[in-house]
A protein has these predicted regions:
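Feature detects amphipathic, helix-rich regulatory segments
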Residues: 1-198
Length: 198
């Protein structure tokens, strides 16, 4: 992104004009649908480094006193304590109606593409810059919803967001596929190494 013009250096055909600076809160609404307590909730968590939202599988059941909140497929989530470690994700369909505490808030999206948002906030020039500004020099960096929603974001039209999000998702799928192939080849090589030498 060229800072002065707010236009990216590379664009898809048919899209022109400057991107607009807005606040994240212009596009997200906090969701607080009460769920179960810690003992009964089907839990999910947000992985670090933009790896998404996954089922929480730890043995600890949680406290009867801890309130959980229902999360819906397509919502955006982040980890308050792990903001500076890019704990961001979109709730997948497979985890619809799973729950988290308020330490991992969820938001409904309006006129912003989830894949576009996810890819933007996982860039270091977003989460480090705004995460550090938000909390100064405190050791425990907890980014509250109000602070997050007030952060600026530069966005194109919704149509361009969708195009960018779909393109980046396709690249992620290719990376995953090739990573699996690489792991398989490593395993094949290891098997040969074990059997080809005395």
């Amino acid at each position: 992104m060229q800072e002065k013009t707010k236009e990216p250096e590379i664009r898809f055909a048919g899209f022109t004009g400057a991107w607009e600076q807005r606040k994240i809160g212009d596009y997200l609404t906090l969701s607080k649908i009460p769920g179960y307590t810690g003992v009964d909730a089907k839990k999910l968590t947000v992985k670090l480094w933009g790896k998404g939202v996954v089922e929480k599988t730890d043995i600890y059941g949680g406290s009867q006193n801890t309130q959980y909140y229902v999360r819906r497929a397509g919502q955006f989530m982040y980890g308050k304590l792990d903001f500076l470690h890019a704990a961001f994700g979109i709730v997948p369909k497979s985890l619809d109606r799973f729950e988290s505490t308020l330490d991992s808030p969820a938001f409904d999206l309006h006129e912003i593409d989830g894949a576009f948002l996810q890819n933007r906030v996982t860039q270091q020039n977003f989460y480090l810059k705004f995460g550090n500004i938000a909390n100064g020099s405190r050791k425990a960096k907890r980014i509250h919803e109000v602070t997050f929603l007030d952060m600026p974001i530069v966005v194109p039209s919704y149509a361009e967001q969708k195009k960018i999000g779909a393109f980046l998702n396709k690249l992620d799928s290719l990376l995953t596929l090739h990573q699996r192939k690489l792991e398989m080849l490593k395993n094949v090589k290891q098997a040969f190494l074990e059997k080809m030498f005395v």
